[in-house]
Design a protein with these regions (language model features):
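Bacterial N-terminal signal peptides
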Residues: 1-11
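Noncatalytic, solvent-exposed loop/strand surfaces
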Residues: 13-420
Length: 420
């Protein structure tokens, strides 16, 4: 029998305004990975400072999002879940879950069978549920690769499905959708080498821009000094800017990064900050609002420091990020690109896929085993502490989310709510 709290969630799930304390998309409002709140713990373990811990139906690298007293999260079941044999790929399903923020109970679970054929044997650390949902307060939108883009109401009822491409890739699909006014923006680089805008109410395609290659991140929105909004993607060798209203290509900037781009760029005051690449990494800042090839006019700086997976944090004129493999964290001067510090964390979080979050002046770097190292967000490295879940032997590939004074961290097995 459903508890009163769950019944309340169902009865009131008719839409609400996004609050400042909500975390409505990948990396929170504006995709900046930051919260102005305070009180999030800086220490925890499997036995301390855990408000609740909920077993998940299956693994995933997607992040939780929040809307009021609800959490939305994806996972997959039926195939290659890391428990026992791989199973039959025809049994693959992706799930959108709704959980109660107060106690972690699963309110509803909507499963979507995969559209065959599907990519077999995607590595377990990437899997089939890597895209983070997004909400506008009335609906929840998810991207499940070639299976499609979906809209659900807040009770888990499917409202529409849209097809953005059918190409497969051995790394799977990972980009998270974002919302701009009435548009749902989807980076379908894997599925069709395109950036697609859908009408969020109907799922109908509004525009499509091609030529987006080797790009694995959420689209980034930037406002120019003239007040115009552009949508930006970083891809192999280039950063591209498009008119968000019609998808018209506006500008491109050569990066010198000759491999794929995974980290989501951050934007501030008309400037796009991007890091990425695999071997070698790189980073740059480019001013939006140009036309054509802006490499010689709008590129502000370029460095040979970057990271392959986690996205950066921009805070008080500095860009912070972690190398995914080396245990090294960086602080760059956001105006010049000059290295302020480049130091190895001790204790080491291990390999990092999760993007950091900034809360109350602290940056949280979460390693894939389950150890989080907390540092001060200042231009001199100061380690404040570390906290570990699952004996640092788990599978934590997702970026944390902030819910008021609590931190939400998911592994392949559990969703944790950390705080009092």
């Amino acid at each position: 029998m459903l508890g009163l709290a769950v019944l309340s969630l169902l009865h009131t799930a008719s839409g609400q305004t996004i609050a400042k304390t909500d975390w409505p998309q990948f990396r929170g409002s504006g995709a900046l990975g930051r919260s102005d709140g305070a009180g999030v713990p800086t220490t925890w373990s499997d036995d301390t400072n855990v408000a609740w811990k909920t077993p998940l139906p299956g693994p995933g690298a997607s992040s939780p999002i929040t809307l009021g007293n609800r959490i939305f999260l994806t996972c997959h079941t039926g195939y290659n879940t890391g428990s026992g044999g791989a199973g039959e790929i025809s049994n693959l399903k992706r799930h959108l879950l709704c959980l109660n923020l107060a106690d972690g109970k699963i309110v509803w679970d909507t499963a979507i069978p995969a559209l065959m054929p599907e990519q077999e044997r995607i590595r377990e650390d990437h899997g089939y549920a890597s895209s983070t949902p997004v909400t506008d307060g009335e609906r929840v939108y998810v991207f499940f690769g070639k299976t499609g883009v979906f809209a659900f109401d807040l009770n888990g009822k499917q409202l529409w499905r849209a097809d953005v491409g059918s190409t497969l890739n051995g790394w799977g699909s990972a980009t998270s959708p974002v919302i701009h006014k009435d548009l749902l923006l989807v980076n379908a680089s894997v599925e069709s080498e395109s950036l697609v805008a859908l009408d969020k109410r109907t799922g109908k395609e509004v525009w499509r821009a091609g030529g987006v290659q080797e790009s694995w991140h959420a689209p980034a929105l930037v406002t120019t000094p003239e007040g115009k909004t552009e949508v930006v993607v970083a891809m192999m060798k280039k950063v591209l800017g498009f008119d968000v209203t019609d998808g018209k290509p506006l500008w491109s900037c050569n990066t010198g990064i000759n491999w794929y781009m995974c980290p989501t760029p951050v934007t501030h005051e008309g400037i796009v900050y991007a890091v990425g690449g695999r071997t070698p990494n790189g980073g740059l800042a480019v001013r939006a609002g140009g036309r054509g090839d802006v490499t010689g006019t709008h590129l502000l700086w370029k460095v040979n420091k970057g990271t392959n997976v986690p996205s950066p944090i921009l805070h008080e004129g500095h860009l912070y990020f972690a190398h995914e493999n080396l245990g090294v964290v960086y602080c760059l001067n956001a105006k010049t690109g000059e290295t302020v510090y480049e130091e190895r964390l001790s204790p080491s979080p291990g390999q990092i896929y999760a993007s950091p979050v900034l809360v109350g002046g602290n940056i949280y770097y979460t390693g894939r085993g389950g150890r989080t190292v907390i540092v001060a967000a200042q231009p001199a490295l100061k380690v404040l502490g570390e906290a570990t879940l699952e004996n640092n032997r788990g599978a934590f590939n997702a970026s944390p989310a902030v819910a008021g004074k609590r931190l939400l961290i998911r592994s392949n097995k559990f969703l944790y709510c950390l705080g009092n």
